[in-house]
Amino acid sequence: MKKTIVSLILALVMALSFGLAQAETSPIVEPEEGKVTPVESGASCDLNGDGKAEQITYEVHNDDTGATETYVKLTVGDQELKIEGWYMDEKVYLLKVQFNTYLLVFDYGPSDDPETHFIYLDDNGKLQDAGSILANPNDMVVNRGIITGSVRGTVLYTWYHDADYMIANNIMEGGTRHVVNLPRPFYAMGLVVKAKVDIPLYAQQGGDSVALTVKAGDTVILSGSDDKQWIYVTDKDGDNGGWLAVGGEYGIDLIVNGQTMSGSDVFDGLLFAD
């Protein structure tokens, strides 16, 4: 009888020790709403809101030589997902947005072209990729479900602006989620350049009424853009200005007097970082 009691006590002590060891090696992380939080491999978090914490492990593989794949392999339970990229951050992050928790995998990109992947655990316990934002997760700000990050502009030259995103939930397809851009009508640029040619600036986008004609040699300000088709240009004092159309396949050309010209042939002082 004594041996049985002793055996039971030993078994209980071992079980408690194992549980404590697990707790020490697998801490439970509870991210705050809207706060990007780094998570160590082996930590646990309730990813799908079922009240149970899932253990998260990940493996990061970077190869500067390009001889092998560069990736992050996520494992949650028996589910695995590999995200490939250019140069991956050594850490994975957590972000809770409107009570939904996401794993963020960050790729530094080929040339300061960051990309953050949003991974979630669906209702069936499978890891899914909701899409990505071309921004560093550490620079992201979340306000009422809107995620704002600093992204690279796409028109004319190398510049950056804040961009807004939300994560849409498609309940018609089993609750699949998708990162969606919320375009703003105007993004600030603020670059001072010098005109190389005479440039008519229009009072309205798509209009034919000229608001201001810039002369070759004039100093002007690229005030802002919709980052798609139009750039607003002002005089050096910022008092008068008008719209200039973007042209070309890659958004680095401008349309001047109906003619498509390279942006570098229109303005001196454009910045390019690649």
Which sequence ranges carry the predicted segments?
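Positively charged n-region of N-terminal signal peptides that target proteins for export
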Residues: M1-I9
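Bacterial N-terminal signal peptides
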Residues: I9-S17
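Sec-dependent signal peptide cleavage junction
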Residues: L16-I28
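Acidic, glycine-anchored loop motifs typical of Ca2+
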Residues: C45-I56, V97-L104
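Short aromatic loop motif centered on NTY/YTY
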Residues: D89-L121, G125-L191
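Beta-loop motif signature
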Residues: R184-D237, V256-D274
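A short macromolecule-binding patch
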Residues: G238-G251
